[in-house]
Regions:
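Signature aromatic-anchored transmembrane alpha helix within multi-pass, membrane-resident enzymes
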Residues: 205, 226-231, 381-437
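Membrane-embedded helix bundles of polyisoprenyl
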Residues: 9, 98-117, 122-209, 225-237, ...
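Periplasmic/ER-lumenal interhelical loops and adjacent helix-loop junctions
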Residues: 29-48, 235-312, 361-372
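Start-transfer (signal-anchor) and selected internal transmembrane alpha helices
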Residues: 1-18, 222-231, 313, 319-328, ...
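Extracytoplasmic
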Residues: 254-256, 430-563
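Membrane-interface helix-loop-helix junctions at transmembrane boundaries of multi-pass membrane enzymes
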Residues: 211-226, 308-351, 412-415
Length: 563
């Protein structure tokens, strides 16, 4: 049952990186910025495990102080699972595979879970297609692989539904399963675990308001399962959490402003560059709504929102899940809008509930617009249930009574009933999904990672002592992480005093770039241009920086100079 949808989703995922498959070990989405960051950590996990290093801390970046890996979106679990591919074909290949798995796995996971509420496979398929290839996913696919891996979120929804609502399985089975999934999410993308806990709490609150009597009778089972899940999750996650909270190079304070990227009221209905059908007038409006293109994926479209509302209204009594999904969707959309309402790029000053949420433990650095992924999942649920309900209603309506036999009455179906019901339900999916058709894969910017041949040649072993410190010119930075990919291509033979990762600054708060230094300042000015003029004092300080970092080798693209 799942094979055909999974194959289709995988083909669509591969299409997102279509040009890369000509040379998947060299071609990728730039290999710089966030993409290069992710590639480095995929390679680090394989290298650390293979060489007996602590995978949760590294001084291969920002030497000698290093980086607490758990404070970064380092994908420990995916890195571990992809280690065989990384060892054989390198980080670029593993990254390309990871992106495809993220798209296909997210869609397939949603398909399987949605069949609980929408048993008709085409309805669940449409919901999976929406969740796995929404504008949110297309945007995050431009470089944020950790936010692209949503395949565990529907599984958590399924387990919470079992634990809080259905309760057909013993809590001592559901609780441990939820714990394992939560820890897997922690080791994939910690921000998603935090946001899932937030939305799970809101969803539970909606349940209590809508169905207080049912909740009351199910409360002991639910609390027992949640408590067991919490205990087991803490035990399983003890080592990584201890490293994050008490280990070296831990951070204090918030990592980023929650309001940095947030949904505009119009962003839900105005298409952006992430979708194919976006007229120039809409693009002009979208460009003024704030954020960058990767963090502008809240677009759902008017047709989908109208269908979602219609499903809630029409199936209000017959399918209670739509009531829950409708109110939870509204709450999620409000939270994704940040601390105050913004309309058309203009601040209204109207306060929103996120002002309270951002002060909750573990949620201080939550990026509000990323909650749009939960809005997509809820819309996928409503679309799937709506299609399933429409098909059932049409089949019932087209049924005609047959002559009674004995004491009973049977109903005979018209031969065309199933076909017409499926066609109309399919048309509903087309109306909802066509406006969300992703932009061409060409927009992904697939290109050669352009790794200088020197880093993959025997010259590295000949000129660079294993574990020594090396500086590339240009050095790695938040503006260009390409030198980190060069380091991974050289199999982490050397450490670097620069990089692009979250680590504590002088005040303990997070920063992504290197500590201030004369050498780093000069290199930054060289990158920006024009060439700086250096006096004797600057040269002396730069040499002192290199000596303090114990630098043995300086590499200018394809040339190595050892000193």
């Amino acid at each position: 049952v799942v094979l055909v949808p999974a194959v289709i989703y995988t083909a669509l995922g591969m299409l997102r990186l279509a040009p890369a498959w000509r040379a998947p070990t060299k071609l990728t989405q730039c290999g710089c910025g966030d993409g290069g960051f992710t590639m480095w950590y995929l390679g680090w996990m394989q290298y650390a495990l293979g060489h007996g290093h602590n995978p949760l801390f590294t001084d291969w970046l920002f030497y000698p102080t290093g980086v607490n890996v758990m404070w970064n979106v380092s994908l420990p679990l995916p890195g571990f699972l992809l280690s065989p591919l990384t060892a054989e074909w390198g980080v670029i290949f593993s990254y390309n595979v990871l992106v495809v798995v993220a798209f296909a796995g997210t869609a397939t996971s949603a398909y399987l879970v949605l069949r609980r509420w929408a048993p008709w496979p085409p309805a669940a398929f449409a919901g999976g297609l929406l969740y796995g290839f929404s504008p949110y996913m297309i945007g995050q696919g431009l470089g944020h692989a950790h936010m692209l891996l949503l395949l565990l979120i529907p599984v958590m929804l399924l387990l919470l539904d079992e634990l809080l609502v259905r309760q057909q399985i013993r809590f001592w089975i559901t609780g441990p399963l939820l714990a394992v999934v939560a820890v897997a999410q922690l080791l994939t993308a910690e921000e998603l675990l935090a946001s899932a806990a937030l939305i799970g709490g809101i969803g539970a609150g909606v349940l209590i308001v809508l169905f207080p009597g049912r909740v009351r009778t199910r409360l002991p089972h639910a609390l027992a399962g949640l408590a067991l899940a919490g205990v087991i999750a803490l035990a399983l996650a003890a080592v990584p959490l201890k490293n994050q909270l008490t280990g070296p190079q831990r951070l204090t304070g918030t990592v980023s402003s929650p309001d940095l990227y947030r949904a505009d009221l119009l962003s839900w209905v105005v298409p952006s560059r992430l979708v194919h059908f976006a007229p120039p007038a809409a693009l002009d409006i979208s460009s003024r709504l704030g954020g960058n293109v990767a963090e502008n994926g809240s677009y759902l479209g008017i047709p989908l929102l109208v269908i979602a509302v219609g499903v809630v209204v029409l199936l209000w009594r017959s399918r209670p899940v739509v009531r829950w999904a409708g109110f939870t969707l509204l709450a999620v959309m409000v939270l994704a809008s940040g601390r105050s309402l913004k309309v058309g790029g203009h601040e209204t000053g109207v306060p929103l509930p996120f002002r309270v949420v951002e002060h909750l433990p573990l949620l201080e650095s939550l990026v509000s617009i990323r909650l749009a992924s939960y809005a997509v999942l809820l819309c996928a649920l409503l679309l799937a249930v709506g299609m399933d309900g429409l098909r059932g209603w049409i089949r019932t309506w087209q049924a005609e009574p047959a002559p009674a036999e004995g004491t009973g009455t049977r109903r005979a179906w018209r031969p065309t009933a199933g076909v017409s019901a499926g066609a109309l339900a399919g048309a509903l999916a087309v109306v909802a999904l066509l406006p969300l058709l992703p932009t061409s894969y060409r927009y992904n910017g697939i290109r050669d990672a352009d790794i200088p041949p020197w880093f993959t040649s025997v010259a590295v072993q000949a000129r660079v002592p294993d574990g020594s410190v090396l500086v590339t010119l240009p050095p790695a930075s938040p503006q260009t992480s390409a030198p980190m990919v060069w380091q991974s291509a050289a199999h982490y033979r050397f450490k670097v005093p620069f990089g692009y990762s979250l680590h504590p600054g002088d005040d303990g708060r997070g920063q992504f770039g290197p500590y201030p230094s004369t050498f780093g300042g000069v290199m930054a000015r060289v990158r920006r241009g024009p060439q700086p003029r250096l006096n004797a004092e600057s040269i002396r300080e730069m040499r002192a920086n290199l000596a303090a970092w114990q630098v043995r080798t300086v590499v200018l693209r394809d040339q190595a100079h050892t000193h």
